[in-house]
Amino acid sequence: KITVLGTGTSVGIPALGKLGWGNCDPLNPKNRRQRCSVLIQNENTTILVDAGPDIKNQLIEHNVKKLDAVFITHQHSDHISGLDELRPFYFYNREKIKIYTNAETSEFLLTRFNYLFEKSASSQSYFNPPLELKHIEYFEELNINDINIKSIKQNHGVIDTLGFIFNDKFGYCTDVVDFPDNSFNSLYNLKVLIITGLRENPHSAHAHFDLSFNCCLLYTSPSPRDSG
């Protein structure tokens, strides 16, 4: 089961101030968009990708009672600033929540959210860090219970981000403008692909709509190798 929790921009839709709804129709309820995040679930396992500033309301809305793992695509605020909201999952069963991400993002998280991962002399005596960092490489494969996850490398302008493929069927590629050559083969033959489509016109850090649409057509079709 795939549940899309949010598909909004970094400031959400509507945005504060004069940005407002932008070109979106405020009369269409689907245009009210929270920050990007997705749940992957089956009967035994619940995996969250990204935890932005809307994550508490997103998880409450979908009645999420446990998390087996959290995967973080990159260190931008709209993908990580809700990590503190995950503490109650630890309070319930006293098992640290595993946060999977790359080395660059891990380093950033330890700087910004050190108290969530490491106990310090200044911490309250009763406060135990509820999260545990798990470093993953690009193109690594692992299993969370009965769900298989493969990570791929994506370009997001001045930084690289993680994309994820679940059970060789579902690809989640947010905040990407281009893929390196060795990411392409991993994406073929998907049943479902969710990919950034920020604007109608090209953008330096996000794929625009036509590029995203063509990616979906390409990667949810058989690989050229399979078609001879």
Question: Where do the model's predicted regions map?
Answer:
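Binuclear metal-dependent hydrolase catalytic cores
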Residues: K1-C173, D181-N185
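N-terminal low-complexity segments that are often proline-rich with Ser/Thr-Pro
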Residues: D226-G228
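Short, small-residue-enriched loops and turns at beta-alpha junctions
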Residues: N201-H203
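Charged helix-capping and loop-helix junction motifs
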Residues: H206-F213
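Conserved small/polar residues in nucleotide/adenosyl-binding loops
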Residues: Y219-P224
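A short alpha/beta connector and helix-capping loop motif
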Residues: D181-L198
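A conserved mid-protein helix/loop that constitutes part of the nucleotide-sugar donor-binding site
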Residues: D178
